Amino acid sequence: MNQLHRRMGTFSLMMVGLGSMIGSGWLFGAWRAAQIAGPAAIISWVIGMVVILFIALSYSELGSMFPEAGGMVKYTQYSHGSFIGFIAGWANWIAIVSVIPVEAVASVQYMSSWPWEWAKWTSGLVKNGTLTGEGLAFASVLLLIYFLLNYWTVNLFSKANSLITIFKIIIPGLTIGALLFVGFHGENFTGGQSIAPNGWASVLTAVATSGIVFAFNGFQSPINMAGEAKNPGKSIPIAVVGSLFVATVIYVLLQIAFIGAVNPSDIAHGWSHLNFNSPFADLAIALNINWLVIVLYADAFVSPSGTGITYTATTSRMIYGMEKNKYMPSIFGKLHPIYGVPRQAMFFNLIVSFIFLFLFRGWGVLAEIISVATLISYITGPITVMTLRRTGKDLYRPLRLKGLNVIAPLGFIFASLVLYWARWPLTGQVLFIILIGLPIYFYYQAKAKWKGFGRNFKAGVWMVFYLLAMMVISYLGSDKFGGLNVIHYGWDMVLIAMVSLVFYVWALKSGYQTEYLKDAKEINSQLLNGQSEAAAGKE
């Protein structure tokens, strides 16, 4: 069996997107953003949404054109061949698979600060912001639970995720209302200081490193589940954009409530000194909102677990998709004959999740790595969708975006800027993690006797030079972003925009009608035939 079951409607797919976005990001993101940017963290969330929206629009057109499992790791291969397709797919998979352990870490970290006398033992689960041996054991159990809920069928996943996501929307809503009503301090938004007490550069850094990009990363989950969508042409764009907007409203309101609820004395020496183990629960305890404390500690399991369950599903489809691209062993392309899920891919991702869990035991470190790896994978979306407008003119497009010739380059530039805002040396460190995957690509190229390698490498080499250019600019850039200050603040971002535009043009000209585009056309024609049959059935 090698065909996935199409059972998910628009609502289920939107819940997948929301379920991916409202995880540990809401439990920790507002605190980290406020710590970095102060009250201006509200602006950071809006900037982050705009950046991700421009990227998501490109992927929405692609997702509606090619409704297949693990689509996010396949699209670039259709437009530029296997070399850059592998880099983008590998970066995307690294970013997504590492979300699974970070959600487990978040649950255990909240658990470590349980205030009840009978639960004092939980304080030993976390020391200095990282999990202890006992903490790792609890997190490992959570990983197994995520795995088992996806093991049998997509129906079980879909039902469990929709229920969990509804719960995850209600709890942030209750938190927002309670904090605004009981303990709102309007002076926290100015307090005699600038709204951006740490400078406007910190507002930009917060977008990249506080968990904002990490939180919005879930927009791609409906795209990766497109192979199981009943009507992907309609469902994918609605699910992607709809879940992004709903999540933004929730996150902005949470940020406002968090900033207003902090005791002014706690920020007397600056927002950077604000330290919490369980941010919203700690605020609820300080304000004596006892019912909210209990609800938040319960949600600290539900929200991250819901996201962990979602990503366990989507990452298995990504490995399934990478096998179809000939980047992974054929065993990962097999589906269970009854349940229609890629179990071997799920086992592989479970092992990788354990590796990430034991190597990176803190939420903050994992969130930063995920954010930068995500940005590297995102930059190919605008390139691919515009290239296919030229090389795949005959493809059926259920969603054909107007103004894409403006949206796509802006999305590419915005993603480049956020990558730069992540600060040196983090940008260089994550780039190294991405490059680790190249030996896998070269191994499978050698097995194929380097067939077509020259053309594929030529079409994708711009990506290598782009990443190197970003590294150099980050290293020499403003000291506000961790650089040597050879390129001063302001001019550094102008340079990033100009360099990005040059690489954008180079990338578009590098695209060609790849051999993989034939497979894409087959998927696309099946979509057209399916919609034609559905229309005929209504008559």
UniProtKB/Swiss-Prot annotation:
Membrane topology classification: Multi-pass membrane protein
Alphabetical keyword list: Amino-acid transport, Cell membrane, Membrane, Symport, Transmembrane, Transmembrane helix, Transport
Cellular localisation: Cell membrane
GO biological process, one term: amino acid transport
Segments traversing the membrane: 11-31, 36-56, 82-102, 137-157, 164-184, 199-219, 238-258, 283-303, 350-370, 401-421, 424-444, 457-477, 486-506
Primary location class: membrane
Protein origin, superkingdom: Bacteria
Observed phenotype of the null mutant: Loss of the gene confers resistance to both serine and its toxic analog serine hydroxamate. Deletion mutant is still able to transport serine, but the deletion of the three permease-encoding genes aimA (ybeC), ybxG and bcaP results in an unprecedented resistance to serine up to 100 mM.
Cellular component terms (Gene Ontology): plasma membrane
Induction: In the presence of glutamate in the medium, the expression is reduced five-fold, at high potassium concentration (5 mM). In the absence of glutamate, expression does not respond to the supply of potassium.
One MF term in the entry's GO annotations: symporter activity
Keyword Membrane recorded: yes
Protein family according to the UniProt entry: Belongs to the amino acid-polyamine-organocation (APC) superfamily. AGT (TC 2.A.3.11) family.
Chain's role: Major glutamate and serine transporter. Cannot transport threonine. AimA is the major glutamate transporter under standard growth conditions when glutamate is not limiting in the medium.
Protein name: Glutamate/serine transporter AimA
Organism: Bacillus subtilis (strain 168)
